[in-house]
Amino acid sequence: MSKEIKAQVVVLGAGPAGYSAAFRCADLGLDTVIIERYNTLGGVCLNVGCIPSKALLHVAKVIEEAKALTEHGIVFGEPKTDIDKVRLWKEKVINQLTGGLAGMAKMRKVNVVNGYGKFTGPNTIEVDGEEGKTVVTFDNAIVAAGSRPIKLPFIPHEDPRIWDSTDALELKEVPGKLLIMGGGIIGLEMATVYHSLGSKIDVVEMFDQLIPAADKDMVKVYTKRIKDKFNLMLETKVTAVEAKEDGIYVSMEGKSAPAQAERYDAVLVAIGRVPNGKLLDAEKAGLEVDERGFIRVDKQMRTNVPHIFAIGDIVGQPMLAHKGVHEGHVAAEVISGKKHYFDPKVIPSIAYTEPEVAWVGKTEKEAKAEGINYEVATFPWAASGRAIASDCADGMTKLIFDKETHRVIGGAIVGTNGGELLGEIGLAIEMGCDAEDIALTIHAHPTLHESVGLAAEVFEGTITDLPNAKAKKKK
């Protein structure tokens, strides 16, 4: 017999978008239920995504920094990896955060129902859980059911040596030779981790650069740093994958393809994600789901069914947790009666590689495509005292300005902890700041952060830390 629950709001999915929406609903006085397939809150991001990957990237960074100190007179022995302890560290990080979410849900009196939820009507969702079925009747629903890794039909995904991002983060073993299919953010982050732990890494990417969404000049800095660590096969694609007893054999074609099928101990398929819109029986609620699995929404996150909202990966690109969180707040506030809208000028993107590649607002390629009259100002970290002292002088900070209004419309940073420096640029774009606003803001010295102000000085023609191309010529 099914258990029945009634709620003013039900949130389907407890990733960052979903739990943020549920907690905001509760804070606004709404009786809220949240449905989650995992045993803990946090969704893919906290359990098998953003957070565990950052825990492992921290380990990788420390290993690489220790090796680099040899050049400065500090010599360590070869690191000895206890993979079980590394895994425990990752799990400790996850448990701390998911435990915190459980406490906040309890404090807010959010009812958590574990299991897979599907619509059975415009006001009902049935949850199939370990302890049986639960039917949730709701006044309003917020769909935050996320996405899953893309699978290709010619790849034997059932073989345990064929990984998706979830498998890679389980850290069951460190393969001797690992192929990363896809030179995007997820693939390169995992390449960083497994290289530091001892794997030989091949990366195959069909485009002519890694991280295709970013500008080439920024990616070039990253590629220069890692070209001796990874075997990069650009403008190349996988055509066949065969699982044999002694390994996974991969055939490729393109500019860098090997002549024969290459043997690997494991293959990570990191070619993107697909939304879960078609897994929810959405049609039973009258919801429109497009052919790719996305649910279309307006700026209030409302679907074609007025009392059902959708947020996060399932509503479209970019599939980023921080976008979903803000969408979740908007949906909750609209349900509570507020006239709020999701209308950001910019959404930041970060590849947490080493060095990090981060950008916000217009990229240079986007500005060109849109016919914007723009000007680029860059500050190389080779002129930064802090970067030189910290042994990361190969970084660069770039700002993109509207040439007519002098307003900043985009920015990018490549370098150690580059993602941490992105906030000022995002705020400047949202606030409509021009180059002078940024240049006249006093930035602390010596910091990597001051490179943002110095890039603005380059545009303004007031830079004194570099040769000034805009200086007045002496007679």
From Swiss-Prot:
Keywords: Cytoplasm, Disulfide bond, FAD, Flavoprotein, NAD, Oxidoreductase, Redox-active center. This is Dihydrolipoyl dehydrogenase. The lineage of its organism: Bacteria, Pseudomonadati, Pseudomonadota, Gammaproteobacteria, Vibrionales. Disulfide bonds join C45-C50. The gene is lpd. The active site is a redox-active disulfide bond. The branched-chain alpha-keto dehydrogenase complex catalyzes the overall conversion of alpha-keto acids to acyl-CoA and CO(2). It contains multiple copies of 3 enzymatic components: branched-chain alpha-keto acid decarboxylase (E1), lipoamide acyltransferase (E2) and lipoamide dehydrogenase (E3). It catalyses: N(6)-[(R)-dihydrolipoyl]-L-lysyl-[protein] + NAD(+) = N(6)-[(R)-lipoyl]-L-lysyl-[protein] + NADH + H(+). Its main location: cytoplasm. Pfam families: Pyr_redox_2, Pyr_redox_dim.
